[in-house]
């Protein structure tokens, strides 16, 4: 059976560029693993591959939902498994590319089972958040379960609420309460991008400047005119959330810019923390000039489950 390849890494680490270069050399079907790219209309601020690029290098699971349509790790797993099967039927390599760690985990390990919602506890947490604020509840989460808190932004109300609900209701950490059910069909090889932090921060700034030049503020105005509910996941996404605040007149453009950069760096840090906990066959420094050729080596050389650090010093 044709192996699937996971290409994982933090935001702005060059995943798309590397994926299309690999597609120039191998018969590859690119499958997006990104919880924001599934939504239509969120194009510039998400760094969604351009329509022209996607016409040349099709990306599955991009623009498959309206922003107010629900989507989840479970639905992603169903969609991705279907795309993988289609690629293999055509004799092509499924290349799954993205930075949404939970989607990768769900695809590889199946869907996690967690305790059901507790309405009374949820109401109590909501009331506490009204008075203390979500960052305070995030600090409480960090005390109870540092690992879970490290992967959740201080203003991510939905995930903070759910995490505290599980911990306080079950008396267990998230990892202790979580049980994954499922397996991945066929062989799988994982490649994790590990960029130098200074290089990644520079890329984040450069990419954000490009977004602004490409019309990100117009995109914010267009999305605001569509009157989507502010609590929708896409509306709370990094970059968008900060500029919706600006659009509503609650901060200056300079403040929104700095807040968006800081939030994007924090997102990259959380993603890096997640991927450090993942096992992989290969690790790659994408800042190297020969990163594309090294990736091709990783995708084609024989493997027997061994771990390689090609082009990356883990010392």
Swiss-Prot record:
Residues that hold substrate according to the record: 11-16
Presence of keyword rRNA processing: no
Keywords: ATP-binding, Magnesium, Nucleotide-binding, Transferase, tRNA processing
Swiss-Prot/TrEMBL site (Interaction with substrate tRNA) positions: 100, 122
Enzymatic reactions: adenosine(37) in tRNA + dimethylallyl diphosphate = N(6)-dimethylallyladenosine(37) in tRNA + diphosphate
Keyword Phosphoprotein among UniProt keywords: no
Cofactor (UniProt): Mg(2+)
E.C. number: 2.5.1.75
GO biological process: one example: tRNA modification
Sample GO molecular function, one term: tRNA dimethylallyltransferase activity
Region Interaction with substrate tRNA, annotated ranges: 34-37, 158-162
Residue sites binding ATP per the record: 9-16
Pfam families, per database record: IPPT (PF01715)
Superkingdom field: Bacteria
Subunit annotation: Monomer.
Family named by the database record: Belongs to the IPP transferase family.
HAMAP family: IPP_trans
Function: Catalyzes the transfer of a dimethylallyl group onto the adenine at position 37 in tRNAs that read codons beginning with uridine, leading to the formation of N6-(dimethylallyl)adenosine (i(6)A).
Protein name, per record: tRNA dimethylallyltransferase
Organism per entry: Acidithiobacillus ferrooxidans (strain ATCC 53993 / BNL-5-31)
Organism classification: Bacteria, Pseudomonadati, Pseudomonadota, Acidithiobacillia, Acidithiobacillales
Primary gene name: miaA
């Amino acid at each position: 059976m044709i192996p699937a390849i996971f290409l994982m890494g933090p935001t702005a680490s060059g995943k798309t560029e590397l994926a299309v270069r690999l597609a120039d050399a191998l018969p590859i079907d690119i499958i997006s693993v990104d919880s924001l790219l599934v939504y239509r209309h969120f194009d510039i601020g998400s760094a969604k591959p351009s329509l022209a690029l996607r016409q040349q290098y099709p990306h599955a699971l991009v623009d498959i939902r309206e922003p107010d349509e629900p989507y989840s790790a479970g639905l992603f797993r169903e969609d991705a498994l279907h795309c993988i099967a289609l690629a293999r039927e055509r004799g092509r390599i499924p290349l799954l590319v993205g930075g949404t760690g939970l989607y990768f985990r769900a695809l590889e390990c199946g869907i996690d089972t967690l305790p059901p919602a507790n309405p009374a506890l949820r109401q109590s947490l909501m009331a506490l958040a009204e008075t203390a604020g979500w960052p305070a509840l995030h600090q409480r989460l960090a005390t109870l379960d540092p690992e879970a808190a490290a992967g959740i932004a201080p203003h991510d109300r939905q995930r903070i609420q759910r995490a505290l609900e599980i911990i306080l209701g079950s008396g267990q950490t998230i990892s202790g309460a979580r049980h994954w059910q499922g397996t991945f069909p066929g062989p799988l090889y994982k490649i994790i991008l590990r960029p130098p932090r200074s290089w990644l921060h520079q890329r984040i700034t450069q990419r954000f400047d490009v977004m602004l030049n490409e019309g990100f503020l117009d995109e914010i105005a267009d999305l605001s005119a569509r009157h989507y509910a502010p609590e929708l996941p896409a509306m709370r996404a990094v970059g968008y959330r900060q500029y919706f605040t600006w659009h509503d007149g609650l901060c200056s453009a300079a403040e929104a810019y700095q807040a968006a950069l800081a939030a994007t760096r924090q997102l990259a840090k959380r993603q890096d923390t997640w991927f450090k906990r993942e096992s992989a066959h290969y690790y790659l420094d994408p800042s190297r000039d020969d990163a594309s050729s090294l990736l091709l080596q990783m995708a084609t050389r024989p493997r027997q489950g061994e771990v390689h650090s090609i082009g990356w010093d883990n010392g």
